[in-house]
Amino acid sequence: MPYLHRSLRPQPQPVPRDARTVHSSGHSFEQLRQSCLQSGTLFEDADFPASNSSLFYSERPQVPFVWKRPGEIVENPEFILGGATRTDICQGELGDCWLLAAIASLTLNQKALARVVPQDQGFGSGYAGIFHFQFWQHSEWLDVVIDDRLPTFRDRLVFLHSADHNEFWSALLEKAYAKLNGSYEALKGGSAIEAMEDFTGGVAENFQIREAPEDFYEILEKALRRGSLLGCSIDTLNASESEARTPLGLIKGHAYTVTGLDQVNFHGQRIKLIRVRNPWGQVEWNGPWSDSSPEWRSMSLEEQKRLGHTALDDGEFWMAFEDFKTHFDKVEICNLTPDALEDNTLHKWEVTIHQGSWVRGSTAGGCRNFLDTFWTNPQIKLSLTERDEGQEGCTFLAALMQKDRRRLKRFGANMLTIGYAIYQCPDKDGHLNRDFFRYHASLARSKTFINLREVSGRFQLPPGDYILIPSTFEPHQEADFCLRIFSEKKAVTQDLDENIDIDLPELPKPTPQEEETEEERQFRALFRRIAGEDMEVSAEELEYVLNAVLQKKTALKFKRLSLLSCRNIISLMDTSGNGKMEFEEFRVFWDKLRYWMDLFLQFDVDKSGTMSSYELRTALKAAGFQLGSHLLQLIVLRYADENLQLDFDDYLNCLVRLENASRVFQCLSVKNKDFIHLNINEFINLTMNI
């Protein structure tokens, strides 16, 4: 039987108890409500105040808005009136049609709706001016608490509102979502699939209608039957076309909701229909099968009633599926499970989640087009061990989401262009270097790199080990990300970030004076001339000695070593604790310095006297310091310049402090354990000396 959504009055659902409350007080919704009831006050949310800061970040309201509680707007406010339905969603003076389309779709799935809109609240008994809504964010559910003060102008809600003026669940839901993202202005412009995922924790799937499979109608039918949320839109060629109205009443660049599918007999033919809703609550399709079109006159009243046909200008309309494919460009589906819509069976999916970051200078390597930095991206090992039932391969879905970009819009952040590539894993552990990607092609990749919040793809590969590389398209772009891997059989994933491993050589014994080289004899003469008979130099004197020697190294381009570097060198080599360096200590350090210079010259590929911060991981590893990404990020922040380059002085300073810290730890660790115990005095003493 064809599937058609119908409005059902929701049954009260228990409030989910695994959502984390988001409020600066640390108290739950119920604790805050009870506190207000006991004190006889109405809740005021200091985290999202009734002020312009909650409205806009780049402008001021053109007219003065007045924040009012529902009881100050109407005499008998209701939270939900006659069930939460798609007709409760009418767009206001905010360009968030994408959000409204998602909310309209949410009302078609009563179970999902009851999770997002808990029904333990209202304006009757227990009212305290406080409400809460739940949203999925990057692998967890958040319980967002708000007060019920809403922006109005002349006693009318300015933004989202219900067609029934005394119903407020949709307006309060919009406010909670605005709080989650920092302001109402942050909700301007977007994709319906973004909010759909936040309402369900589901998986996005996008279809370009002109490239859709032949059974596209059946795919949509199955999606609705499974409770998926569906949106659709018409592309624009330029900004001037945004929200332009076509002759047939459709709006370009505007988010619509798919609310139903059905088939009817019409003049001896079976016609496939699709029902679509405009969140404006008005402006509809005026072609065949529109509200007042002649096609309906040949349908019985019973059939019209079954299809829910009305001639009201409520924004919802039917159209022939063939017309839909002609006039719309894109369909977005948020599946509540990763099951393929082409598949008739449901599976139990295993899921693993990775939270990571692209950090400029260390892990923001860009796509494979940028070979010199691509290898520095986060690398995730995926082990597929079991074939799917009756299949030769292992099916999995990879969904890469960039985090918090909407909330960061006020700081100039936009959606980055993201994607991923999948490689066969070699028979070795550890972070793969540039040469691997130079000589190996990817086995699979995301369909495209695109500036959407999430990019997802479905793959089937033979059992084995693979490396998944999530990245932005361009290098040096920063963002946090969440990668979800869904697999039919249990898959093992591992972040290939390297563990800290320090390999320090034994300090060499002093060379007898009679065995010194000519260079060492020259050092001794220079050292004696600067230090005097005690043969000890201060940091200032060491600065003079090293710069005098290094300036003769024509292959090494640098201005000079800083006094800070020389102080750190003495801290590393000073065994007597007098703040000076003896000649034998200098000789030991000189051997070390020559090796470090050779490494620097090796990684100064353009002979500019600087090293790229992206090469630092390999350079430090060659020097005996295998470090994880987080520590590398801290080092880059401290030592790299604004162009992500390190000169020799920065490079040397970094190595000296790393070795000093490592040797101090070795001395203090008991039986070579991976931890030490320090009191506050010992800790400060150590940090001041490293």
Swiss-Prot record:
Region ranges (Disordered): 1-24
Residues involved in Ca(2+) 2 binding: E284, D291, L312, D314, E316
Superkingdom of the source species: Eukaryota
Binding-site residues, Ca(2+) 1: L81, G83, D88, E167
Protein keywords: Calcium, Hydrolase, Metal-binding, Protease, Repeat, Thiol protease
Residue ranges constituting the Calpain catalytic domain according to the UniProt record: 42-337
Coiled coil: none
CDD domains hit by this protein: Calpain_III, CysPc
Region (Domain III): 338-521
Active site per database record: C97, H254, N278
GO annotation, biological process: proteolysis
Region Domain IV, annotated ranges: 522-690
Function: Calcium-regulated non-lysosomal thiol-protease.
Protein name, UniProt field: Calpain-9
Species for this entry: Rattus norvegicus (Rat)
